[in-house]
């Protein structure tokens, strides 16, 4: 075995947190950090999952994940990643306080569209501490107050990797399966298919929400995910493996 097929088989041998830790290490250990992998994993995993990933990372690679991220990233992108990895986010069982969410929607507006320049600190504080349910509620209040979708606001107020990270946090909070469906569509671009991304998402979500991802993919793009994957795998063994995973009920 070699190449992409080997990577996929190896990925199936790990638990989800072990696989995530391995992906994060590979994303930072090689020459040039793969920020997309950091965003995809750190923005979408629960505080409990991130805690376990940090433990596995320390055990397997003898490195503190937070310190490693600090050494391999920079600027506000680094600050947001580190804030999330502190695992201070509420879990989804945390009660949603409507008043607090309303106030924080106003704070986001005041720190972004409502002023000259952007207060990145208030965005980081809220995005790195609130549960998915709270973020969805904040997004609803933001739309009611400003008349704009918060994802559109992030698009206009930020740039680069920070923008991608903030958008990923909110997109997955609103609909995690839809977020991964869009990532898979990017990976299945016929012009430049990204097999590493395909492997990463299909393997890591195979025991989580792949059925929902397939449905979101069809709803968005009016084509079955498995058909796009067949076109882009470019390896008969990898294609068969993907099809076997995607055909599971």
Describe the function of each predicted region.
Residues 1-249:
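Structural signature for extended repeat/solenoid scaffolds and their inter-repeat hinge/linker regions
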